[in-house]
Amino acid sequence: MFSREMNIADFDPELANAMANEVERQEHHIELIASENYCSPRVMEAQGSQLTNKYAEGYPGKRYYGGCEHVDVVEQLAIDRAKELFGADYANVQPHAGSQANSAVFMALLDAGDTVLGMSLSEGGHLTHGSHVNFSGKTYNAVQYGLDKETGEIDYAQVEALAKEHKPKMIIGGFSAYSGIVDWAKFREIADSVGAYLLVDMAHVAGLVAAGVYPNPLPHAHVVTTTTHKTLAGPRSGLILSSCGDEAIYKKLNSSVFPGNQGGPLCHVIAAKAVAFKEALQPEFKAYQQQVVANAKAMVSVMQERGYNIVSGGTDNHLFLLDLIDKDITGKDADAALGAANITVNKNSVPNDPRSPFVTSGLRIGSPAITRRGFKEEQAKQVATWICDILDNMGDESVIKRVQSEVVALCAQFPVYK
């Protein structure tokens, strides 16, 4: 039998120390990685529950194991809340991650070798949208679209031209590094013109969509996938949604998730999703998402005033790309310099980037995490000022030390977990 007094620190101090150091890092660093966020203690409680012990292959009411009556309730709660949150007719809460959700959709709707049309990774897409290093680019014939070189927005004319030329079986909308509003209706129009499925990967903007501050792709896409962390602020996991009304597609999706791509679901993570979905249904969640966008816009305004180039000219969501080509600063060096000052970002390729993905000429910056800890426009502008100070004085240790001290002081005023 296990005593509930058992803990990691007494048994494995080396691991406990690493975990404690990560807690300290999160509290004393400003987190600007657009795909990261802080989940609530309720979400972490669910993930650390005894539900982790239960195997439950199958779906609620149709399991391959006994003793699933309680996890059936848990999963159905998550399904029902996901449907309510996004206005969906169908929801599968079992995918372990966004990539697994995308893989399941590919397997459900395509055959190996079929053509897919997705956004280029170097222009803001995701690995699973047809990158040659990913299953989506290895198993399928991937064609890639990008941004209009003049406006920095999605080049819908190119999407349409490529669709007519290559006749893809599926078109993918969505992104990992694009700061504009996507015209989901236009994507569906193009998909219908060539008889293609439309898959929308809304992983980055799911929280914004749930709160009604970003267009919902459900009325337009055949299938929508997402992660459940990022702007949604839940556990690190995946979700498949649809409102297409085609029961045959829903059946294919379920079979593709299990047994096609996965075995048993992670019941403790599904419980955490159920909690996160209920949190996202609360009125304060909309206010949070509105502040996420306001903070991103505030940061952009400061950086533009300081002479920095923002891809697409600004932001309408939670993230933006800082183009450093004209500053002759690599994304790798900028990332390291900011990290030394307790500001965490990620290097990112920018359109027409002359440098490799391991070096890059840009930074991706996001506001979900700083907003989650309570930052408003005032603090967001201060953070942007610090970033510019460091980038304007690359290699100046005195600037880094000064900013680091000020960052720690600000973080102390806005603890993540009190």
UniProtKB/Swiss-Prot annotation:
Pathway: One-carbon metabolism; tetrahydrofolate interconversion; Amino-acid biosynthesis; glycine biosynthesis; glycine from L-serine: step 1/1. Its cofactor is pyridoxal 5'-phosphate. PROSITE patterns: SHMT (PS00096). It holds the Pfam family SHMT. The modification N6-(pyridoxal phosphate)lysine is found at K230. One of its GO terms (molecular function) is glycine hydroxymethyltransferase activity. GO terms for biological process: glycine biosynthetic process from serine; tetrahydrofolate interconversion. The record marks H229 as: Plays an important role in substrate specificity. Keywords: Amino-acid biosynthesis, Cytoplasm, One-carbon metabolism, Pyridoxal phosphate, Transferase. One of its GO terms (cellular component) is cytosol. It is found in: Cytoplasm. It catalyses: (6R)-5,10-methylene-5,6,7,8-tetrahydrofolate + glycine + H2O = (6S)-5,6,7,8-tetrahydrofolate + L-serine. PANTHER family: SERINE HYDROXYMETHYLTRANSFERASE. Belongs to the SHMT family. HAMAP family: SHMT (MF_00051). Catalyzes the reversible interconversion of serine and glycine with tetrahydrofolate (THF) serving as the one-carbon carrier. This reaction serves as the major source of one-carbon groups required for the biosynthesis of purines, thymidylate, methionine, and other important biomolecules. Also exhibits THF-independent aldolase activity toward beta-hydroxyamino acids, producing glycine and aldehydes, via a retro-aldol mechanism. This is Serine hydroxymethyltransferase. The gene is glyA1.
